[in-house]
Design a protein with these regions (language model features):
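Glycine/small-residue-rich interface belts in oligomeric ring/scaffold proteins
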Residues: 11-83, 87
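Internal, conserved structured core segments that host functional sites
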Residues: 62-132
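A contiguous pocket-lining binding segment that forms or flanks enzyme active sites
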Residues: 129-170
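Short, well-structured alpha-helical segments that form the helix of a local strand-helix-strand
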Residues: 98-105, 172-181
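A general structural signal for short secondary-structure junctions and capping/turn motifs
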Residues: 7-10, 46-47, 56-57, 105-108, ...
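Conserved small/polar residues in nucleotide/adenosyl-binding loops
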Residues: 184-188
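Structured loops at beta-to-helix junctions and adjacent beta-edge loops in soluble globular domains
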Residues: 21-22, 58, 69, 118, ...
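Short beta-strand scaffold segments in enzyme catalytic cores
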Residues: 3-7, 53-57, 113-118, 124
Length: 188
């Protein structure tokens, strides 16, 4: 399960804390995070099949991440949809505010997705079901419709909260993102 854990409380020098993984479609060729030549100041991995990305940040502080949402009724129409990785890439390459960007996204042109975008001042979330409010201090996004609770997501959320309530290291966040793999015996 792909996972985005995001907290935006005032944590000392941190504007937000993010921990994320890309945990499916391993056979799909990707390039590890790098500074893109054709987009000034963009640090992101790259989907080598479609050219987009699942998570990226710019030197100016723009951030975006996407997960797919399993909507099996769409599978037979797959060839008619745009790449979800372009949602991230296009936001990071635009000057639109997060609110303006999500208003312009035509969600019906993509297979199921959850997208988080930010300029470090404002955060917005849009899914294939529409624009969502982002007023929580902690957001957990997986491969299901937003606000869907599963054991995997609940466990990851509780572990993330626990880490945030103490002095944490980058390694703590890496271990957290590897941990949900051990939850695979649980039903999503």
């Amino acid at each position: 399960m792909c996972l985005i854990l995001l907290s935006k409380p005032s944590l000392g020098d941190y504007k937000f804390v993010l921990s994320s993984n890309r945990d499916e479609f391993y056979e799909r060729k990707t390039k590890n995070m790098f500074w893109w030549n054709n987009f000034d100041g963009l640090l992101a991995g790259q989907d080598l099949e479609q050219g987009g990305t699942w998570l990226g940040i710019t030197k100016s502080g723009r951030f975006a991440a996407v997960t797919n949402v399993r909507e099996f009724y769409q599978i037979d129409k797959k060839e008619n949809f745009l790449s979800r990785g372009d949602l991230v890439k296009n936001f990071l390459n635009s000057s639109l505010s997060p609110e303006e960007y999500v208003q312009k996204v035509e969600a019906n042109k993509y297979m199921g997705f959850n997208l988080v975008v930010s300029d470090l001042k404002h955060f917005s979330i849009i899914s294939s079901q529409g624009i969502e409010s982002f007023n929580q201090e902690l957001v957990v996004v997986g491969n299901r419709a937003l606000n869907t609770e599963t054991k995997k997501l609940n466990n990851a959320k509780e572990d993330f909260k626990s880490i945030l309530n103490q002095t944490f290291t980058h390694q703590d966040l890496i271990e957290l993102m590897q941990k949900p793999v051990s939850y695979t015996h649980l039903r999503a």
